[in-house]
């Protein structure tokens, strides 16, 4: 349903039918076609006098003509599709008009063909838009077209037949009629019962048909009202677009949310109306229930008078398994609720709304059938009461005839049983409708509450924007709070990002190292300043006063709201982009901090191990000495030779020794104090930093950093070479303009009687010729340099692929969990993969730019060579040039000649091109050519560049 509404809202059909003048699409196409035809005729009328013109016409003008033919064919196909669409619509409209107004239609005289077949022999389809005819019009049927052989009247045919022929015809008609009757095999009484049953069924279906017809007419009127409103609004839109020259359209997310909200509100209104009608039907059913109870009591009274009381068969009415139905409905609702609790996407939301619309439509049909069933129950109950009243009136006459009385009581009992079954069916249908109403209302509420949580399928940024879309309603407060909600969400996102970053730092830090705490806090304050600035900027922004901005008109309000909402979305995207940049900088800073923290942790852990080992040695030497003298001598020996042992330059370690058997020995030791504390300073350990073994992660990081450095240098050289293309193009354009001026002057001088005009023009054209030759040399050097850049780019891509394969291999060995230094964690591997993918994408972009630059330079070189060849023909210097270049061509096997001076030192473009070239010295060639420097800087083995 939503897809159908969207296709109707954004169709070219509006542009071609609503406007009074021709559509802009058709005007644009016609104007474009006229311009192309004029240009193509101009191309065709040109004459190819010279070989160069013929080559230009074949290689450049011929593809243009081919493109024009293709575009003309596409335009013709588009017009043909529109014509096909219009012709089908017109044919169906003609059929509808012929059906509604046959007196205005001229019937063609056809041959003896079947009236139900078209001209091609296929059966004629009924008119499509018969339901579009307004109600209240008595539509006559289309009269049959008379055959050629049946133009004679009936009286003329009867007059030519005799009485024998008439009798024969009558008897044959009766025989055919009797043979056509199908035998059912029922008796007369059974046939009467079957006829009565079928007639009642027909009556019930006709009643239901009337209800469906009334609901259809109401829906039909509402449909055309909406169609007229849409047409008027579209006319206004088109007029405004024509007036202001605008072509703006609604954003897809806004249109999607508006359509979904409108569909849900329509479903909610329809359900409310159906529930009101259902309440009326329930009240009528309760009234009929009381009447059925009264009829049952009257029937029991009659039966007890004439017969003995038997087991009450009427109470054994067949009932449906209500418990099973309740269980099925509850399970279906639970499954729908579980599905709705999942994250909704746009496609799922559209599917759920379509299901809801189909459910509401089926509820309308079921409610109409329930109302018709209640009316049928009322008529059946009326008939039952009439039969009971008749039986009560005739009971005096039927007392004598017991058989007839018993038959009538049996018939009345069957009728009462049927009425009770019908009432039970009404009750079951009512319960089913109530359950369906509950499920539909819950579904509407769930979908209305989850429109804000809908996520896009492909675009993550679109998901965040779509979550902010409110449910469209008539209240202005929800619209007024739209911008404040978006700004609060932006602030929350900034704060959440900052808190998550603080949490990551807190997990990486250890409470044993105070210096690392200070370092991380300093870094967090440094990296969090930009996010805080963003928050303060958002806080400083003042929200506009929407009450003053909104005018009185509803359309103007919608426009203002749409503009403000668009600005809010734009600000949101800008803030999100800034947050992404801040996060990227923070990640880079955190990576460096993580490396430093890891080094500090390793150093501290190593020193802790050494301290513990030295403590154990001290404890064992103090406790395990067998004799005091040996212990004292040993202690004195150790103190004499190793007075201090230090692990780090600032670490002091004190040991308190208070055993009772060492007090005297300590007193006898010279140079000792009487204190029981002995401060030992360890200084035997080497203070030089340990050589750190690089891990696989460090190796990969080093390779990636090396590639990044090479990328910087490569980008510098690549940008320089790309900028040279513009310089070459400008120079060639200037030279071409000067040549055109010289040609104009030469034509003017040829018209004058002077004879020295050719020599003057030739002397002025020779510097331009030499300059063009130098540019051709420079272009050849640029092409060779670009080949070197291309090879280097392929080698860089191959190195990136090798690094990526190494990361994948190490990650596959570890299984995503880092166990040792020879493995990489899954998170770090993902970061490396992301960096490599970014570099690959940069390489692809560079490759594309390089290919486009090569094409431009080749085209420029071809143009320069064409100008040079023409100048050589005009100046008559081709022979000298060929004589001078013959040995070089034979030695270089057809390759273009590059002067040695230009190859070694490069060519410097001249500023004043019209002046004669001065004698060059060797000092002007000191600066080396950038092309040669780029050519010899890198030589990598080429890899395979991706397509």
Swiss-Prot record:
The protein's job, in short, is: Plant-specific actin binding protein. Associates with F-actin at the plasma membrane in growing pollen tubes. May be part of a membrane-cytoskeletal adapter complex.
Q: Which domain of life is it from?
A: Eukaryota
Q: Where is this region: Disordered?
A: 105-131, 618-675, 743-763, 911-947
Q: What is this protein called in UniProt?
A: Protein NETWORKED 2A
**Where are the coiled-coil regions?**
348-454, 568-619, 722-809
Per UniProt, subcellular location reads as: Cell membrane
Q: Name one GO molecular function term.
A: actin filament binding
Which stretches are tagged as biased composition: Acidic residues?
A: 109-118
A GO CC term attached to the entry:
plasma membrane
The UniProt family comment states:
Belongs to the NET family.
